[in-house]
Amino acid sequence: MTGGGKSGGKASSGKNAQSRSSKAGLAFPVGRVHRLLRKGNYAQRVGAGAPVYLAAVLEYLAAEILELAGNAARDNKKTRIIPRHLQLAIRNDEELNKLLGHVTIAQGGVLPNIHQNLLPKKTGTKPGKNASQEL
């Protein structure tokens, strides 16, 4: 009787399988990003750190956009994020607007903007200095 362990004849190191996403502390799938980088013919070879870095960047961008869109939804007294909230979040943020400047968001609408020349002119007379109040 050789190898009298409880492993059932299978040599195991005692560690459970851990995904690369959980090792990196990410929610985005590192394995899927790696597969897409390989299948996309971007390069002949893909390093081990490249999909981790790319997944982290994508997760950060998604979190940033969703944070701003959630704030826009809350400002409009809504509990559900709609494309209009995404549009407002992206267009009101300078860096995201620069990154996604040529992106069209379906059902996003436009930013409310009225040109200064079209606004009614304010009269500059102050009360107490009218000519009708002479003695």
Swiss-Prot record:
Entry keyword set: Acetylation, Chromosome, DNA damage, DNA repair, DNA-binding, Methylation, Nucleosome core, Nucleus, Phosphoprotein
Post-translational modification: Phosphorylated to form H2AS128ph (gamma-H2A) in response to DNA double-strand breaks (DSBs) generated by exogenous genotoxic agents and by stalled replication forks. Phosphorylation is dependent on the DNA damage checkpoint kinases MEC1/ATR and TEL1/ATM, spreads on either side of a detected DSB site and may mark the surrounding chromatin for recruitment of proteins required for DNA damage signaling and repair. Gamma-H2A is removed from the DNA prior to the strand invasion-primer extension step of the repair process and subsequently dephosphorylated.
Superkingdom of this protein's organism: Eukaryota
Compartments where located: Nucleus; Chromosome
Residues modified as N6-acetyllysine: K6, K10
One Pfam family per UniProt: Histone_H2A_C
Listed InterPro entries: Histone-fold, Histone_H2A, Histone_H2A/H2B/H3, Histone_H2A_C, Histone_H2A_CS
Record PTM Phosphoserine, positions in chain: S132
Single biological process term from Gene Ontology: DNA repair
Chain's role: Core component of nucleosome which plays a central role in DNA double strand break (DSB) repair. Nucleosomes wrap and compact DNA into chromatin, limiting DNA accessibility to the cellular machineries which require DNA as a template. Histones thereby play a central role in transcription regulation, DNA repair, DNA replication and chromosomal stability. DNA accessibility is regulated via a complex set of post-translational modifications of histones, also called histone code, and nucleosome remodeling.
Membership in a protein family: Belongs to the histone H2A family.
PANTHER family: HISTONE H2A
Domain free text: The [ST]-Q motif constitutes a recognition sequence for kinases from the PI3/PI4-kinase family.
Protein name, per record: Histone H2A
Organism: Podospora anserina (Pleurage anserina)
